């Protein structure tokens, strides 16, 4: 019979899959090392188990102990699987930018999860680096993993991932491309492959807001390179000991938008449901026809269903390249919402209350015959300057002209021309007896 003694025996030997549609225009053979086939659905299973086994061997991790680590989610999952099989407890410290799915998954496998702010310095006592390190000193019989500086991280990929890639390509691999976070994957694989063939190029994918690319090119740790970014799993505001820059031939930086867009393309065009660091890798590809390129896909798209695989999340960040050409394109996501109005017989105070409640600045005014006027913040301010008791006046005493009404098919250029000092909004006829409003901010928001 052929079976594993436990789930840890299924780690590794993940497949290489040829990429086709998503790499059109790239003449090279591009192969994806799909690490989602690991039991914890990420490449981090490899180094998590290796770090645990090495800590057991030298006595850092003792029976019944508690494993403590700062993680973006995937390392935590790998450590949790090892802890379940081997009988340890887990406490994981994670940043608030990580997906809810990652946090829920860690809790599902028995870990205690502590969430820390993202936008703080690494040395700040609130950072997930500092909190995890502190817990490692405070909790009895605990072991702080520190994947960033733990040599077993890179060693796992030197012993496993590198040899797998070499054997699966029959030694024909010319380039290895991977997102860089802790540095263990790129450094471990690079060391093995360059020992086999020094001409193999190792390329790291970095993100804007991270220090890796500039440090590799100049040797300067530039704090001006550090700012918040959305992409998970790659980039850092520190220099982990596991990043061996001498083994890396170059870095390419990829934007948050490109990472998200290309992650969706991989799922739609290749049927490979992977995380957003995979999208970063694909966007960074530029090679020659004879090259054999191995791109490592870190983790599963299931960790990101509430983020780049969610249209609303993408749209809120301007990541969806939707073509907006008509008034209908602007209002299509809001057609089910009721238009906020005020009636001529109501008071100015009623309009003010609705502006506050719905956080809007313009309101159409109606009577029994339809739209007869409008009121906006400018109208109210000017009325208040001349009459401090304006709130008690009928709205018809302060209203301006009614907003122009356009069809759903009206070109956005024509809609834009209707805006001026007196016209702060335009109404769209939804052709079902209802209307919706377009404001200047809606027009600006449609600009790509």
Give the positions of each predicted feature:
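The conserved cystathionine-beta-synthase
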Residues: 340-359, 365-367, 384, 405-424, ...
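Short hydrophobic beta-strand motif reused across regulatory alpha/beta modules
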Residues: 361, 372-380, 435-443
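Terminal peptide-recognition signature
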Residues: 83, 165, 355, 363, ...
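A short, polar/charged loop-to-alpha-helix boundary motif
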Residues: 379-396, 443-448
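PLP-dependent amino-acid enzyme catalytic core
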Residues: 1-329
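Bateman (tandem CBS) regulatory domains
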Residues: 247, 324-339, 346, 392-403
């Amino acid at each position: 019979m052929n079976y594993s003694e436990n789930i840890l025996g299924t780690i590794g030997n993940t497949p290489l899959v040829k990429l086709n549609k998503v790499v059109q225009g790239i003449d090279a053979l591009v192969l994806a090392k799909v690490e989602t086939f690991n039991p914890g659905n990420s490449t981090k299973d490899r180094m998590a188990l290796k770090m645990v086994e090495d800590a057991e061997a030298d006595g850092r991790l003792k029976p019944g102990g508690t494993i403590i680590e700062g993680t973006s989610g995937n390392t935590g999952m790998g450590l949790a699987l090892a802890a379940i099989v081997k009988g340890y407890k887990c406490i994981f410290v994670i940043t608030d930018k990580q997906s809810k799915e990652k946090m829920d998954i860690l809790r599902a496998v028995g870990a205690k999860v502590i969430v820390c702010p993202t936008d703080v310095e690494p040395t700040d006592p609130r950072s997930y680096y500092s909190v995890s390190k502190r817990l490692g000193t405070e909790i009895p019989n605990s072991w702080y993993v520190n994947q960033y500086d733990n040599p077993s991280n890179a060693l796992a990929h030197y012993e496993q991932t590198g040899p797998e890639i070499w054997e699966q390509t029959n030694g024909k691999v010319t380039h290895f491309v991977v997102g860089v976070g802790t540095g263990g994957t790129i450094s471990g694989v690079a060391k093995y492959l360059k020992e086999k063939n020094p001409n193999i190029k190792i390329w790291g994918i970095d993100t804007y807001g991270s220090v890796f690319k500039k440090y590799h090119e100049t040797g300067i740790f530039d704090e001006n390179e550090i700012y918040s970014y959305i992409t998970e799993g790659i980039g850092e505001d520190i220099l982990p000991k596991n990043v061996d820059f001498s083994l890396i031939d170059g870095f390419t930086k990829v934007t948050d938008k490109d990472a998200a867009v290309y992650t969706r393309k991989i799922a739609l065009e290749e049927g490979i449901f992977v995380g957003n660091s995979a999208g970063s890798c694909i966007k960074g590809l530029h090679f020659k026809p004879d090259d054999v390129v191995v791109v490592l896909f870190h983790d599963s798209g299931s960790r990101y269903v509430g983020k780049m695989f969610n249209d609303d999340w993408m749209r809120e960040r301007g990541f969806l390249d939707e073509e907006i050409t008509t008034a209908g394109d602007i209002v299509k996501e809001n057609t089910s919402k009721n238009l906020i109005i005020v009636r001529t017989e109501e008071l100015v105070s009623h309009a003010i209350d609705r502006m506050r409640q719905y956080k809007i600045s313009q309101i159409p005014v109606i009577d029994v015959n339809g739209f007869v006027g409008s009121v906006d913040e400018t109208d109210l301010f000017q009325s208040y300057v001349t009459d401090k008791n304006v709130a008690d006046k009928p709205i018809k005493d302060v209203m301006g002209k009614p907003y122009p009404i356009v069809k759903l098919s009206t070109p956005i250029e024509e809609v834009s021309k209707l805006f001026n000092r007196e016209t702060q909004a335009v109404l769209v006829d939804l052709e079902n007896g209802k209307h919706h409003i377009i404001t200047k901010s809606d027009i600006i928001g449609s600009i790509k």
